[in-house]
Amino acid sequence: MGVDLRQVVAGILTITMFVMLGQMLHRDYFDAVQEKVQGDAHDIEFHGSKVAVEDGLVRAFEAGTKGPWMEDSHELKPCWSISQSDEAVSSKGYVTFSLTNGPEYHVSQITDAVMVAKHLGATLVLPDIRGSKPGDEMKFEDIYDVDKLIKTLESVVKVVRKLPSHVSLRDIAIVKVPTRVAEDYIKEHIDPIFKSKGNIRVTTYFPSVNLRKSSQGAETDPVSCLAMFGSLELQPAVNELVESMIQRLKTHSKKSGGRFIAIDLRVEILEKKNCHETGAVGSKTCYNAQEIALFLRKLGFDSDTTIYLTQPRWESSLNILKDIFPKTYTKEAIMPSDKKTKYLELENSEYENVIDFYISSRSDVFVPAIPGLFYANTVGKRIALGKPQVLVPAEISGTSGLPANYISPYISKKNHLAYSCFC
């Protein structure tokens, strides 16, 4: 029996179409889904989505001369401006709060506290920093620059270093606010409590980890932009440490022009999630070391690529990644010896979380192997810094893939909240 060549070609095209459609469905889950937080932030699920690639991103990859690396774009400038109506007013009382759960949460917590204090006409009290374990507390100045915070916010809200002695903690009402709290919510739900008690303590909860910008036509509050992207900077000693670690990574990356990849991959979280399938074609909630290694190799990153992992300490399950990419390091391998006693003495300390967050924000490529606010807020900082190469993991059928196809939808679709604040 003869074979009709046209039927064969049509069959091949049909199969190819279904493969491409499956990949697109997989990636469309990445940040289109509103993920709910239940208790521990690490329970948040994460979905991949293959996105339509913009011409500019494709050209950026094609223009590069060193494989899959994407050139940085220019740093964006703040679009927000503080009007007279936004300026600080005389204080009526105090707003207190704490920074908890790591720097990816600090960004949202400081923003919500500033918004509440601003729209209540209250004075903001400098927060403390609390770790995941009871009694694990630090001063704000242990990690962040106090003077920078006060100076940045002085035009919109007054900040004091501590609560006056005449204010009793028993007289402070505890108020829970949803992240990205808006002025209307503050007026309706918080202002009556503030007027009744005179002082409040704000705790932020996260009904969603979505950081997509508001719907078209809706304006982002300039005070929110200022607080989220302008208020938190590392204090000099911590910043110097982060810079030294980045320079060590660049030194290991001479063959790739000093460029390196940061991967948010923590074994404890991967084991908790079990990397189960979600039901979308090929989609997963997280990716382990072997899957990430294959993903990067198929995108064209060679074995000489330097990789930084957020994993606190090396574990045997990471060996496969180091077998494929020998220049793979955790923080203990690149931190100066004289700094380890202070910054690595406590496992999962706030110092370690901060180091991970700021190195991931500054790396040439960022790969989120696990979901959550770490991914979303790291992308926000990278957008402001002009570092758009955030590659969302996926199982690539075949032997290779185009890096531009795996750029985070936050960037390829320009729907991250940061695009409302920078231009």
UniProtKB/Swiss-Prot annotation:
Cytoplasmic compartment residues: 1-6
Pfam families, sorted: O-FucT (PF10250)
Top-level taxon: Eukaryota
Its membrane topology: Single-pass type II membrane protein
GO biological process, one term: fucose metabolic process
Entry's localization field: Golgi apparatus membrane
Binding site residues for substrate: D264, L265, R266
UniProt KW keywords: Carbohydrate metabolism, Cell wall biogenesis/degradation, Fucose metabolism, Glycosyltransferase, Golgi apparatus, Membrane, Signal-anchor, Transferase, Transmembrane, Transmembrane helix
Residues annotated as transmembrane: 7-26
Keyword Hydrolase: no
One CC-aspect GO term: trans-Golgi network
Tissue spec: Widely expressed.
Involved pathway(s): Glycan biosynthesis
Membrane topology, Lumenal segments: 27-423
GO MF term list: mannan synthase activity
Protein's job: Glycosyltransferase involved in mannan biosynthesis.
Protein name per UniProt: Protein MANNAN SYNTHESIS-RELATED 2
Organism (species): Arabidopsis thaliana
